[in-house]
């Protein structure tokens, strides 16, 4: 900030309506849009959203506005909100301003970056079609993740969304020596607390930075929490790392934007959303990308209001996704975890030119077998297995083996299941499913394929079953 700006950089509050604060400055010192200004009395940060004329700036409070009154002094910072970045953020829980909320003292770093920055330039982007191996069989087979891609995670309560996220964080941390950033956007405080303790127990907390804009916080906090997490992820990417970024829940990002838009008096658009919905979503999503230096792969939990996929918020999100992972309650009820639906889930990466002809053929063969089994289930329920043709009986047997082999014991769930977790390479996954579809394991019982990692484990389990 210039010396002239420092001299007259103090204004005073002229109006407070909930989280919307109007501040008057001298005419030559009106803060810029997106600049952070600070209330001297309680150190509350306000982000400027509009200039109303006559030296008055309107902003959104990044914290509770209780206790504010007209006349309080407000100081310009001359810059947008900035947050700590780098290794010091790992293992810490921070709020939207990058302030620690875990009681472990300040974040020990001098490195800070502004949360508002442009997306990487076109010539900086990497046109990579590389697949990110997760070690989770069902994901690697039917909906492979692209390095630097965006994945939508659809799932209701209790189907294993959080456990799947934690396993991905663990696998990236251990197998790829990578870091993760978790942004809780409009997150329930209880969920955030559970997530923190579960990751501590799993031993991966030191590989992840957590940013929470909790559900009970003002809309400004929830609107910017995603950008705070993304800024931390971008720093790691620019160091040459492959980063995994989780956003839970991406739906609450435009929802917070809707609240801010209404508070600022903007004309609502379809279904009451802000008129700038697509632009705001684009500003966040376009920054989540691969450059020639490193990559950010994001997994975003998507809530679909009233299961209406045409709602403007999920519809806008869909435009940015490379893959959709659908967690199904019906599959969870069968005791198959991860409860990922291999017929509903989709990835743009599942293309023979990207993953190779063999991977593509094996994945499609598995889906074809499962689809036929789904069609036959009504007949089986009414008439029983005996009424099926020999070919269909064989197909059903293979489909049930595929379905069970898609389950996998997780490292982060070892505490609950008592089974050691497994990381299965993509090569091993393709080899195993190819053999099951080809009928090489028709002689084995289907129980042998349930909750095992590699096919060798299934063979060993089958031997135990025969002996016992």
From Swiss-Prot:
It comes from the Bacteria. GO terms for cellular component: plasma membrane; proton-transporting ATP synthase complex. Its main location: membrane. Its EC number is 7.1.2.2. It is a peripheral membrane protein. It is found in: Cell inner membrane. F-type ATPases have 2 components, CF(1) - the catalytic core - and CF(0) - the membrane proton channel. CF(1) has five subunits: alpha(3), beta(3), gamma(1), delta(1), epsilon(1). CF(0) has three main subunits: a(1), b(2) and c(9-12). The alpha and beta chains form an alternating ring which encloses part of the gamma chain. CF(1) is attached to CF(0) by a central stalk formed by the gamma and epsilon chains, while a peripheral stalk is formed by the delta and b chains. PANTHER family: ATP SYNTHASE, ATP SYNTHASE SUBUNIT BETA, MITOCHONDRIAL. Produces ATP from ADP in the presence of a proton gradient across the membrane. The catalytic sites are hosted primarily by the beta subunits. Belongs to the ATPase alpha/beta chains family. NCBIfam families: atpD (TIGR01039). HAMAP family: ATP_synth_beta_bact (MF_01347). This is ATP synthase subunit beta. The gene is atpD.
């Amino acid at each position: 900030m210039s010396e002239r700006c420092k001299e007259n950089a103090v204004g005073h509050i002229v109006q407070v309506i909930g989280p919307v604060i109007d501040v008057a400055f001298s005419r030559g010192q009106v803060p810029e849009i997106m600049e952070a200004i600070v209330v001297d009395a309680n150190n509350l940060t306000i982000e400027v959203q509009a200039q109303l004329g006559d030296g008055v700036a309107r902003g959104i409070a990044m914290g509770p506005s209780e206790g504010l009154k007209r006349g309080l002094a407000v100081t310009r910072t001359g810059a947008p909100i900035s947050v700590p970045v780098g290794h010091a953020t790992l293992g810490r829980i921070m709020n939207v301003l990058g302030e620690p909320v875990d009681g472990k003292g300040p974040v020990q770093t001098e490195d800070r970056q502004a949360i508002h920055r442009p997306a990487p330039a076109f010539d900086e982007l990497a046109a990579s079609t590389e697949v990110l191996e997760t070690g989770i069989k069902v994901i690697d087979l039917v909906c492979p993740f692209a390095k630097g891609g965006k994945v939508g995670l659809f799932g209701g309560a209790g189907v294993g969304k959080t456990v799947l996220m934690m396993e991905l964080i663990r696998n990236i941390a251990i197998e790829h020596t990578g870091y993760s950033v978790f942004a809780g956007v409009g997150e329930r405080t209880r969920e955030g607390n559970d997530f923190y303790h579960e990751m501590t127990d799993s031993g991966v907390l030191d590989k992840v930075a957590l940013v929470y804009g909790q559900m009970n916080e003002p809309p400004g906090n929830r609107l910017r929490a995603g950008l705070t997490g993304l800024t931390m992820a971008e720093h790691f990417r620019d160091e040459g790392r492959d980063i995994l970024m989780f956003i839970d829940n991406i739906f609450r990002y435009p929802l917070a934007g809707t609240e801010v838009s209404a508070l600022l008096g903007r004309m609502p658009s379809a279904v009451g959303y802000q008129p700038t919905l697509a632009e705001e979503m684009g500003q966040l999503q376009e920054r989540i990308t691969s450059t020639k230096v490193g990559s950010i792969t994001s997994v975003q939990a998507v809530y679909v209001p009233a299961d209406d996929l045409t709602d403007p918020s999920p519809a806008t999100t869909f435009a940015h996704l490379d893959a959709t992972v659908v967690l199904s309650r019906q599959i969870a009820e069968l005791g198959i975890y991860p409860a990922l639906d291999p017929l509903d889930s989709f990835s743009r990466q599942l293309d023979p030119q990207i993953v190779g002809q063999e991977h593509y053929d094996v994945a499609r063969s598995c889906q074809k077998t499962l689809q036929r089994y789904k069609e036959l289930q009504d007949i089986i329920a009414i008439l029983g297995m005996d009424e099926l043709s020999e070919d269909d009986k064989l197909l059903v047997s293979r489909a049930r083996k595929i379905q069970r082999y898609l389950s996998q014991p997780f490292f982060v769930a070892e505490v609950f299941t008592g089974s050691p977790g497994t990381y299965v390479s993509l090569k091993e996954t393709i080899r195993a499913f190819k053999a099951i579809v080809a009928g090489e394991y028709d002689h084995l019982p289907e129980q042998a394929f349930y909750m095992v990692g590699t096919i060798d484990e299934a063979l060993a389990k089958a031997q135990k079953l025969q002996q016992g």
